[in-house]
């Protein structure tokens, strides 16, 4: 594209006929005739001053009288030399090739704006994909072996427990039998430092009676509770091998009045297991569970009471050394976009109640769990620091109870525990109850979503 010729620029004699005409009408004069002298430096105007401008200057200088008798200095009208651009700098207007300015083709960066980390739409790999990759990578050569070992321990222990869970037994005795059995069968007593993290109990043994839905365990120094004929008892305990947790629960009742309640909950759990699978929508599974559960009724004292699915509890996925993951499987129809994925491990459990179907926290302590995202730098009490060290070395992110601490020989831990709880370093879990006079039942299994099949790892011939 042609560019406009700058003003005052004279073309060469071979470039234009106009330039030739000017040369004829105004023939060039010698330097002495024109009165033009060279610069003190001896340099001529390299740009070539216009002849007309030189002549005009000469005439003006002659016309003006010299009053002081001295030769007046002629004003220098020469144009300033164009400065050549320094190396690495651009001209104005820009005409220097960038390759001459930026060595090695290293050009300036633009504005760097980091992606918002919690916006999956702006990330190449979404949080869901990262979670899936983490789960799949977790399925190493020992994955199935560890899970099957933990499941077999659970089956053998609960088979014995079902023979002794009869009216008249205390909850403390029943819990001790379960915990002793798990420690014996895994080969890890959990007394030496770090031994409980290799294999053993995955969380406090749950022994919940009647309207107590979940999270109750006998604690040292509390009033003894005895199992009665008209009680509905939920037995929920977990076994882990190298952090692979098997979570399974069942309900026992001796009065046939509650048979329909147990049947409803067992059927609902089996429905959840049937619908579970890779890419299964969790909202669909929840809807199917609720439909089956709430199709049952229980007759108590001549009154037909519909079985209600608990709305404040849910099934959940299981992570290594973490009983509760990020996914939940409610027992009622819910709006969620979550799906089950290959490599997921789920605890499919259901709770059915003759009460309101909602739970609330009750006074008491079920267990404790370390909050790994909270810093402990602000701890001042030596007892709290010592207890925190014990928790990290022996339980990590596993939930534990007072009974587990005392089994290891830990004493005088109450003050330190209060300090850890008040600083949010340790979470405290309370029992969950429905309305008084109601009855709640529970059944639960752990299922592995393997690439080519699902394996209900805790299934036995009992339930």
Curated annotation (Swiss-Prot):
GO biological process, one term: proteolysis
Biased composition (Acidic residues): 41-53
Region span, Disordered: 1-96
Group of enzyme by EC: hydrolase
One function term, GO molecular function aspect: initiator methionyl aminopeptidase activity
Polar residues: bias regions: 58-67
InterPro entries to which the protein is assigned, alphabetical: Creatinase/aminopeptidase-like, Met_Aminopeptidase_Type2, Pept_M24, Pept_M24_MAP, Pept_M24A_MAP2, WH-like_DNA-bd_sf, WH_DNA-bd_sf
Biased composition (Basic residues): 70-85
Cofactor remark: Binds 2 divalent metal cations per subunit. Has a high-affinity and a low affinity metal-binding site. The true nature of the physiological cofactor is under debate. The enzyme is active with cobalt, zinc, manganese or divalent iron ions. Most likely, methionine aminopeptidases function as mononuclear Fe(2+)-metalloproteases under physiological conditions, and the catalytically relevant metal-binding site has been assigned to the histidine-containing high-affinity site.
Matches recorded under SUPFAM superfamilies: Creatinase/aminopeptidase, Winged helix' DNA-binding domain
Keyword Glycoprotein on entry: no
Entry's localization field: Cytoplasm
GO cellular component: cytoplasm
EC id: 3.4.11.18
Residues that, per the record, bind a divalent metal cation 2: 247, 316, 349, 444
Compositionally biased residues, Basic and acidic residues: 1-12
Keyword Disulfide bond included in the entry's annotation: no
Residues reported in the UniProt entry to bind substrate: 215, 324
Protein family: Belongs to the peptidase M24A family. Methionine aminopeptidase eukaryotic type 2 subfamily.
PANTHER family given in the database record: METHIONINE AMINOPEPTIDASE 2, METHIONINE AMINOPEPTIDASE 2-2
Protein name from the UniProt record: Methionine aminopeptidase 2-1
Phylogenetic classification of the source organism: Eukaryota, Fungi, Dikarya, Ascomycota, Pezizomycotina
């Amino acid at each position: 594209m042609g560019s406009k010729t700058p003003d005052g620029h004279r073309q060469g004699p071979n470039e234009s006929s106009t330039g030739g005409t000017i040369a004829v009408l105004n023939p060039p004069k010698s330097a002495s005739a024109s009165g033009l002298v060279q610069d003190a430096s001896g340099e001529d105007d390299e740009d070539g001053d216009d002849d007309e401008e030189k002549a005009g200057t000469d005439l003006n200088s002659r016309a003006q009288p010299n009053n002081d008798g001295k030769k007046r200095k002629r004003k220098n009208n020469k144009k300033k030399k164009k400065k050549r651009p320094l190396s690495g700098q651009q001209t104005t207007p820009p005409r220097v090739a960038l390759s001459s300015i930026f060595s090695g083709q290293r050009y300036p960066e633009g504005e760097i704006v980091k992606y918002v980390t919690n916006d999956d739409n702006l990330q190449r790999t979404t949080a869901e994909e990262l979670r899936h990759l983490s789960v799949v990578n977790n399925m190493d050569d020992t994955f199935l072996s560890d899970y099957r070992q933990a499941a077999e321990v659970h089956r053998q222990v609960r088979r014995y427990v079902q023979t002794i869970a009869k009216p008249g037994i205390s909850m403390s005795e029943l819990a001790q039998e379960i915990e002793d059995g798990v420690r014996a069968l895994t080969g890890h007593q959990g007394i030496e430092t770090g031994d409980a993290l290799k294999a053993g109990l995955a969380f406090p043994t749950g022994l919940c009676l009647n309207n107590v839905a979940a999270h109750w365990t006998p604690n040292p120094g509390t009033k003894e509770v005895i199992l009665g004929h008209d009680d509905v008892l939920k037995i929920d305990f977990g076994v882990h091998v190298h952090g692979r947790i098997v979570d399974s629960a069942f309900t026992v009742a001796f009065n046939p009045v509650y048979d329909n309640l147990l049947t409803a909950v067992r059927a609902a759990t089996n429905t959840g297991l049937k619908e579970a699978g890779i890419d299964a929508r969790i909202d669909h599974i929840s809807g199917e569970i609720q439909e089956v559960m709430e199709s049952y009724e229980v007759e108590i004292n001549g009154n037909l009471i519909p079985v209600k699915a608990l709305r404040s509890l849910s099934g959940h996925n299981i992570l290594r050394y973490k009983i509760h993951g990020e996914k939940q499987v409610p027992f009622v129809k819910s709006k969620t976009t979550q799906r089950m994925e290959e490599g997921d491990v789920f605890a499919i459990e259901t709770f059915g109640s003759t009460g309101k179907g909602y739970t609330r926290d009750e006074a008491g302590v079920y267990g404790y769990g370390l909050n790994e995202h909270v810093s402990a730098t602000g701890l001042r009490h030596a007892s709290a620091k010592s207890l925190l060290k014990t928790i990290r070395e022996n339980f990590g992110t596993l939930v534990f109870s007072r009974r587990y601490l005392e089994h290891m020989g830990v004493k005088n831990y109450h003050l330190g525990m209060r300090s850890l709880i008040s600083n949010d370093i340790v979470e405290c879990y309370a029992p969950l109850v429905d309305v008084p006079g109601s009855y709640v039942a529970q059944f639960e299994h752990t299922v592995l979503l393997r690439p080519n099949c699902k394996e209900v790892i805790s299934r036995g011939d009992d339930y």
